[in-house]
Amino acid sequence: FLAVLGALMYSLTLLPALLSYLGPRINSLRVPIPGANRKTRFWEKFSTKVMKNPVRWLLPAMALLLLLGSPFLNVQLTAGGVEALPPDLESRQALEILEDEFPAFTASVVPLVIVFDDGQDPYSQEIASEMETICEGIREIQGVISLEHPICKPGLFVTELEEWPDNDRLLWQTTVSQNIAMIDVATIFGSGTDESEQLIKDIRTQTEGSTQEILVGGWSSFEVDMKQHLSDRIPFVLTFVLLLTMVLVWMQVRSIVVPVKAVLMNILSVSASFGLIVVVFQEGLLSDALNFTPQPLDLMVPPLVFGIAFGLSMDYEVLMLSRIHEAWNETGDNTLAVSTGLQASGSLITGAAAIMIAVFSGFIFADVMIIKSIGFALAIAVFVDATIVRAIVVPSAMRLMGKANWWSPNFGKKA
């Protein structure tokens, strides 16, 4: 937000002042590029060709976009782990060796935190009796290796702490304070698996009936909570973003159809990138070439990619629609307006897209999986948006809608 706000303020204040000060000198030290000054009507000719047979172009393009996006229906999400690092990284190799050779010492641990009421003495046989039942239930859960803690042994509390066995006394002294106690549950399931998520849910079910507040922590618990949070908030966020976007586009072109079409087109380009990152990073299509281990996508990848890619797509869309709308106001001819608008904005959008693709493609060679996948997804989203969507889907769809593109419900007035 701050970066966009800063760029906006710069473009409205400092940039015009600099351009005014430099004047014609802005063209000094130009780099001679062959054919740079040659005028071309490529975008006008191509869009006119598309609009002569809009259905023939639109249906295959839409089918391709839907096909590219369909793998996202099988997406798997995770909070990440050591698999996010390159297979040849020393730290990952060391951990994998330890897991293979000493599984008991590298078992995944789910910490349980018992929060005591103010003034409540944790050294209580009553609390231990209740916790014994809970601990026994947790031990029966599939995937639990062990759960050992003196707070689960009410028989110890008939004696003084000094009389306890050394192991129990040391564990009590290092994991219990006046306000909380921590119990480690060793499990065979690592984070990022369906089994680990089910294990967390089963543990929480066992602790629900306790008179004490018992919190289930750990990386797997964080993953379960993040997925739940995202599933709860994403519908609201999507609704807000899409509605606000349509309102802003409507304020620019005063049309109902065009904003809806703009949002749908951008969703198609973003969904195509979502589908391809599933094929590449989850299914492992380019795992050898890009040096990574196929795995579920990081939880943060889809929200981040959607936010950035949708914003860029709308930026290109608004730029193009503003030119088309200007031509429509001048000519009243929808087909001519579309071809004129694409010709006026096509080169600018293509150049901007090429720059963004080059920038995002550099992220693909990063070592960390989340950066690699985000860079790939954004590069694909921009490429699809600047080619299939802008060159084919938009002109063919607007040609089919005709003058209905510019209808507005403002008392039946034309946009």
Each language-model region and where it sits:
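Structured non-transmembrane domains adjacent to transmembrane bundles in polytopic membrane proteins
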Residues: 74, 79-287, 370
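Membrane-embedded transmembrane helical bundles of large multi-pass transporters/channels
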Residues: 1-79, 209-415
